[in-house]
Amino acid sequence: SRNMGTQQATSVRQLLRFKIKPSWLVAWILPVAIVLLTIFVNSLLPNCEFNTDMSSLIPVDQVTEEQKEMLGMMMNPTFLIVTTIISGLFAGATINALFAFGAEYGWRNFLVDALREKKFVFASIFIGIVWGLWHFPLILLGHNYPQHSVAGVFMMVIFCVLASFVELYFVLKAKSVYPAAIFHGTINAVAGLNVLLIKGGNDLLNGACGLSGFIVITIVIA
């Protein structure tokens, strides 16, 4: 509950310092755990279930029997989960982190410096609200919540507030903005697993940006 300025000295120069620490590894692995737990929680919600049948993803009229057999193996849930996690971890720490860095430089660098004297909880909520509202034009156009674009604006704000607690913790722990970019990039890379592995529900319930994700991230924060 202390002010961020007294809890950690976080100058702009420090936040941009590239010095790998154990917290970077946690920020890299945690998104995978969040997504996998979200899938589990999602499967327990009403009218939702774990999807093990990926056959609908195979364009049967466009492939040979041999290709169909190979695609069937690739669409095995275990194979899909493992390959998505491996590729997601790689992308999350490289190209995705690079793209996420632009946003994180603003949210977890400029705003953190501006809110230095505020308490951690206040800063997390404030940054999360600003970050969430920044998405509202895309959300109204159907991004993330195509079935509920108006309600989706509020859902995105909630997600961003929750994610801000996690990301700001990493920024202050490592005194660097890079773990936030890695967390952001990795969760974007592996979040698609939920779409493939959950049948039923809707965009307000499913995935990291839905109720199931909110439950998991709240547990992580607690």
Residue ranges and their predicted role:
Residues 101-128, 172-176:
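Membrane-interface helix/loop boundary segments of multi-pass membrane proteins
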Residues 28, 89, 93, 97, ...:
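Residue-level signature of the transmembrane alpha-helical core
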Residues 32-37, 129-137, 185-196:
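Aromatic-anchored segments of alpha-helical transmembrane domains
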Residues 128-150:
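Membrane-helix boundary elements
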Residues 67-96, 207-215:
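Hydrophobic alpha-helical transmembrane segments
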Residues 25-48, 168-184:
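Hydrophobic alpha-helical membrane-insertion segments
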Residues 149-151, 183-222:
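C-terminal membrane module of polytopic membrane proteins
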